[in-house]
Design a protein with these regions (language model features):
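Glycoside hydrolase catalytic-domain groove-lining segments
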Residues: 217-224, 228-280
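Conserved, mostly hydrophobic/aromatic
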Residues: 54, 163, 236-238
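Substrate-binding cleft of extracellular glycoside hydrolase catalytic domains
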Residues: 59, 63-199, 203
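Aromatic-lined carbohydrate-recognition surfaces of secreted/lumenal glycan-active proteins
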Residues: 22-25, 160, 164-166, 190-223, ...
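Acidic (Asp/Glu)-rich catalytic clusters
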Residues: 12-15, 41-49, 78-88, 109, ...
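N-terminal module-boundary/linker segments of secreted carbohydrate-active enzymes
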Residues: 1-53, 59, 64-74
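Substrate-binding cleft of secreted/luminal carbohydrate-active enzymes
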Residues: 16-27, 95, 267-299
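Solvent-exposed loop/turn segments at secondary-structure junctions
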Residues: 27-29, 59-62, 97-101, 167-171, ...
Length: 299
C-alpha cells in the first residue's frame, strides 16, 4: 500500500539520519504495576513520551482466541494499534504460533506451544501441499489474515506494520528453529507464509522482517545473520534479537555486523529485541546500548 511504502521510506531515512526509534513490547497494554490504563506506558512514565515503536504479538489468533498469548484481548489490541498509529508510532508484530501438530487445549507447557520442539517433521509437513498439516496451517493463516485485514485506520485504510514471522530461527527452542527444520524447509516455510498472506489473502500492509537470535560474539557474524536467508526478494527488513546481558562486546559486534549487512543488502535494519528485565544499572541504555549504535546506523 502507499502507506506501507511511506513507512519503509521513513525507516530508511531514519537510519540514514543517524537517529533511532526506541521501542517497547506491549507498551500501551501493561507495565510495572498497571494494566489496561488508557494513554499510559512505562516509557512515557520515565521519559515523558511514548516509545516510537510499539510491538505486539499475534500469538493465539490461530485459534480465534479472545486473548493473545500475553493476555491482551484481540479487540483491545486492535484499538491500541489504531491509537499508536494515529500518534505516529511505528507498529511491529511477531507471532508465537502454537505447534499445529501437537497443539491441544489443556496440555502442560511446553506441549503444543511455540516452544514444543519435540517433533522435527512439523515444518516439512506444513509445506507439503495437500497434507493434513498443510490444510490445518492454511486455516490458521486464514484466521491471522482476517485479523490483519481488520487493522485499519479511521478512514478504513490498512495500517502498515513490520511483521516478524518465524523469529529467532537460529536457535533450537521453537518448532521452526534449527533443531526442527532443514535449511531448505525453513526457507520454504518463509516463502509459503509470505506468498499465502500476500497472494492468496491480498495483504499488502506488512514489511517482512527476519530476526535471528544474536546473543554472543560469533566467529562469523555475517554468516549467523544470514542463516537460512530466504532470499533478498522475500525479506524487507533485517532485524536481530540480541539478549546479550551485560556482554557489551557481543552487542557491539552484532550491531556493527547488521549495519554493514544493511548497506550490503540495501535494506533497513534494526534491533528487534534487546534489553534486561529489572535492570538496576541506570546507565545501561546510554553506556551499553547507545554507545554501540553511535557509529553503526540502524533504524
Amino acid at each position: 500500500t502507499p502507506e506501507t511504502k511511506a513507512m519503509y521510506q521513513y525507516l530508511l531515512e531514519t537510519q540514514k539520519s543517524g537517529h533511532i526509534l526506541l521501542g517497547h513490547h506491549d507498551a500501551l497494554a501493561y507495565g510495572h504495576g498497571w494494566r489496561d490504563t488508557p494513554g499510559k506506558s512505562d516509557v512515557k512514565e520515565m521519559t515523558g513520551s511514548h516509545p516510537a515503536v510499539c510491538s505486539m504479538d499475534f500469538g493465539k489468533i490461530e485459534h480465534n482466541a479472545e486473548k493473545n498469548i500475553n493476555g491482551i484481548p484481540f479487540d483491545k489490541m486492535r484499538e491500541l494499534i489504531r491509537y499508536a498509529y494515529q500518534r505516529g508510532q511505528t507498529i511491529m508484530m511477531c507471532w508465537h504460533v502454537d505447534n499445529p501438530k501437537t497443539y491441544a487445549p489443556g496440555k502442560p507447557y511446553p506441549q503444543g506451544t511455540s516452544w514444543d520442539n519435540s517433533d522435527n517433521t512439523v515444518v516439512r509437513e506444513i509445506i507439503q501441499e495437500g497434507s493434513p498439516l498443510n490444510t490445518t496451517f492454511k486455516t490458521w493463516l486464514d484466521r491471522l489474515a482476517a485479523y490483519i485485514l481488520s487493522l485499519t485506520d479511521e478512514q478504513g485504510k490498512p495500517i502498515p506494520f513490520i511483521f516478524r514471522p518465524w523469529h529467532e530461527h537460529t536457535q533450537s527452542w521453537n518448532w521452526w528453529g534449527s533443531k526442527c527444520a532443514t535449511d531448505e524447509e525453513f526457507r520454504a516455510l518463509w516463502e509459503f507464509t509470505l506468498r499465502y498472506l500476500r497472494d492468496e489473502k491480498g495483504i499488502h500492509q506488512m514489511i517482512y522482517a527476519i530476526s535471528p537470535q544474536m546473543d554472543e560474539v560469533y566467529p562469523d557474524t555475517q554468516k549467523r545473520l544470514t542463516y537460512r536467508w530466504p532470499g533478498d526478494k522475500l525479506v524487507d527488513f533485517i532485524g536481530m534479537d540480541c539478549y546479550h546481558g551485560r556482554n557489551k562486546k557481543a552487542f557491539a559486534s552484532n550491531v556493527k555486523a547488521i549495519a554493514e549487512l544493511s548497506v550490503q543488502k540495501q535494506k533497513p535494519c534494526g534491533i528487534t529485541e534487546t534489553g534486561i528485565e529489572g535492570v538496576n544499572y541506570p546507565a545501561y541504555f546510554t553506556e551499553e546500548v547507545q554507545a554501540a549504535l553511535e557509529n553503526n546506523p540502524v533504524s
